[in-house]
């Protein structure tokens, strides 16, 4: 597509919210002291897969991109651009983290360093492809500016590994589910980027496998009561974040022929099944209270967003402070209720799935 440079807008920052993609850092020295010998062969095998670079020639724009997109209505276009923006930011965040891990671990952990370097290659490729797609709608992210001016959220290494493993796996299930749906219903493919999701999601899957292999090399991350609590927490945090985000943007999923709630339920179920191959415990999604509580959280979150979007007199603003506090209280209360729902031991869960 030929762009009008006068209309192309460059965005340097993204709005920071509780649910927005973030940039992470960690204790690199702690990771450099890991003993990965117990699972070295699996880690090395995955790095060998990364070296093959199966998608080296995959992310090449074809002639289908060479057109205008004025047929997409304004609301759908806005929601789609938001989808591209969030996806690009998340991929770029992964690129920065993996690149820094590769740099910091190069001397002491060369195999891990190479794995992270090759994953950063994939993430950069994804982010660049998404940013070019945004340019088709006259918007780009200034990734160079974001690199220099990013704000970090610090996570301990074990939290990085739990969260990123799940993020990569849920990314896989999101991409492959959208791809399979649009293969069956091509009339809903509003933009050609969706054709790339089948091979794209395999990068996400391999990245998740790499994190799983590292976690397995550190038994303390999977053994004991405390580890079970952390696995439960990150499963819930990742699932709730996706659910609340997608409920905000339901019109986008409807525009490609998906029911946003059913899409999220399916992705959560499949990610939960994937996590059962690694984690000692997973969530009991058959408990009807699980999605009931998530729906309540989504409702409270929507009300909070509506308050922030309204311009109101000072008196109403004061009242809204208390109302927002009440809604946050309900959100936290429901999250706590979700956290303390009974979980499923993974040995019994695997038998149930089979």
Swiss-Prot record:
EC number(s) on record?
1.14.13.81
Per the record, what are the reactions this protein catalyses?
Answer: Mg-protoporphyrin IX 13-monomethyl ester + 3 NADPH + 3 O2 + 2 H(+) = 3,8-divinyl protochlorophyllide a + 3 NADP(+) + 5 H2O
Q: Where in the cell is it found?
A: Plastid, Chloroplast
- Keyword field: Chlorophyll biosynthesis, Chloroplast, Iron, Metal-binding, NADP, Oxidoreductase, Photosynthesis, Plastid
Biological-process GO terms, alphabetical? light-independent chlorophyll biosynthetic process; photosynthesis
Name the top EC class: oxidoreductase
The GO terms describing molecular function are: iron ion binding; magnesium-protoporphyrin IX monomethyl ester (oxidative) cyclase activity
| Functional pathway | Porphyrin-containing compound metabolism; chlorophyll biosynthesis (light-independent)
Q: Main subcellular localization, coarse class?
A: plastid
| Reported cofactor(s) | Fe cation
Q: Which InterPro entries does its entry note?
A: AcsF, Ferritin-like_SF, Rr_diiron-bd_dom
- One GO cellular component, as annotated: chloroplast
The Swiss-Prot or TrEMBL record describes its family as follows: Belongs to the AcsF family.
Cited NCBIfam families = AcsF, PRK13654.1
User: Which HAMAP family is this protein grouped with?
Assistant: AcsF
Tell me, what does this protein do in biology? Answer: Catalyzes the formation of the isocyclic ring in chlorophyll biosynthesis. Mediates the cyclase reaction, which results in the formation of divinylprotochlorophyllide (Pchlide) characteristic of all chlorophylls from magnesium-protoporphyrin IX 13-monomethyl ester (MgPMME).
| Full protein name | Magnesium-protoporphyrin IX monomethyl ester [oxidative] cyclase
Q: Which species is listed as the source? A: Cyanidium caldarium (Red alga)
The top of its lineage is: Eukaryota, Rhodophyta, Bangiophyceae, Cyanidiales, Cyanidiaceae
């Amino acid at each position: 597509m030929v762009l009008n440079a006068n209309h192309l807008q460059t965005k340097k920052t993204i709005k920071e919210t509780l649910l927005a993609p973030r940039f992470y850092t960690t204790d690199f020295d702690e990771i450099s002291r890991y003993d990965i010998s117990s699972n070295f062969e699996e880690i090395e095998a995955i790095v060998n897969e990364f070296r093959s670079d199966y998608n080296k020639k995959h992310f090449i724009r074809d002639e289908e991109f060479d057109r205008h997109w004025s047929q997409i209505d304004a609301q759908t276009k806005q929601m789609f651009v938001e989808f591209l923006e969030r996806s690009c930011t998340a991929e770029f965040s992964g690129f920065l983290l993996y690149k820094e891990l590769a740099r910091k671990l190069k001397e002491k952990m060369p195999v891990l360093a190479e794995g992270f370097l090759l994953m950063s290659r994939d993430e950069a490729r994804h982010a660049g492809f998404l940013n070019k797609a945004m340019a088709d709608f006259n918007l780009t992210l200034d990734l160079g500016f974001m690199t220099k001016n990013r704000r970090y959220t610090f996570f301990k290494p074990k939290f990085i590994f739990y969260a990123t493993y799940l993020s990569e796996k849920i990314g896989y299930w999101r991409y492959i589910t959208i791809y399979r749906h649009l293969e069956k219903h091509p009339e809903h493919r509003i933009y050609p980027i969706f054709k790339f999701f089948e091979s794209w999601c395999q990068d996400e899957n391999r990245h998740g496998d790499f994190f799983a292999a590292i976690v397995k090399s550190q038994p303390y991350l999977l053994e004991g009561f405390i580890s079970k609590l952390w696995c439960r927490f990150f499963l819930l945090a990742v699932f709730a974040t996706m659910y609340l985000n997608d409920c905000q943007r339901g019109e986008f999923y409807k525009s490609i022929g998906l029911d946003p709630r059913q899409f999220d339920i399916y992705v959560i179920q499949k990610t939960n099944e994937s996590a059962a191959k690694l984690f000692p415990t997973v969530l009991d999604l058959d408990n009807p209270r699980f999605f009931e509580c998530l729906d309540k959280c989504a409702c409270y979150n929507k009300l909070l967003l509506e308050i922030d979007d309204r311009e109101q007199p000072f008196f109403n603003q004061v009242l809204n402070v208390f109302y927002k506090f009440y809604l946050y209280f309900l959100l936290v209360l429901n999250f706590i209720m979700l956290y303390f729902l009974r979980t499923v031991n993974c040995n019994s869960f695997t038998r149930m799935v089979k």
